[in-house]
Amino acid sequence: MWNEFKKFAIRGNVIDLAVGVIIGGAFGKIVSSLVNDIIMPLVGLILGGINFSDLSWKVGKAEVKYGAFIQTVVDFLIIAFSIFLFVKLINTLYERVKKQEEVKETAPTLTKEEELLTEIRDLLKQQRETT
């Protein structure tokens, strides 16, 4: 059982996923800071000094914090757009590599024998044309 677990844990997909989760978490913190500390205060200033995180409705004893929700939505949109751009970049690079491989595959590579036979054929053609 231990060996199976080691094989599972060491496989590339699991390690890639772990790295992605860690980097994604760190990226999420950066984007949250961007939204909370830079974007939303500027939007609040433009709209007359509103602090979005303080916006809420009180319904009885319950408090609906729609300002925090707005910040979370902006946070999500920035993260989603960043991921979209990253995936688009990766797909573009993948397509370029794929096209380069297709070009390499379409160009026939001749063996030594084929090259020699081609040279002999060309020489024979030249001899016939000159005579």
Curated annotation (Swiss-Prot):
Coiled coil start-end: none
Extent of the signal sequence: none
One Gene Ontology cellular component: plasma membrane
Entry-linked SUPFAM superfamilies: Gated mechanosensitive channel (SSF81330)
Membrane topology: Multi-pass membrane protein
InterPro entries: Mechanosensitive_channel_CS, MS_channel, MSC/AndL, MscL_channel
Localisation per UniProt entry: Cell membrane
NCBIfam families listed in its UniProt record: mscL (TIGR00220), PRK00567.1-4 (NF001843), PRK13953.1 (NF010558), PRK13955.1 (NF010560)
Assembly information from the UniProt record: Homopentamer.
Family membership noted in the UniProt record: Belongs to the MscL family.
Record-given protein name: Large-conductance mechanosensitive channel
Native source organism of the sequence: Geobacillus kaustophilus (strain HTA426)
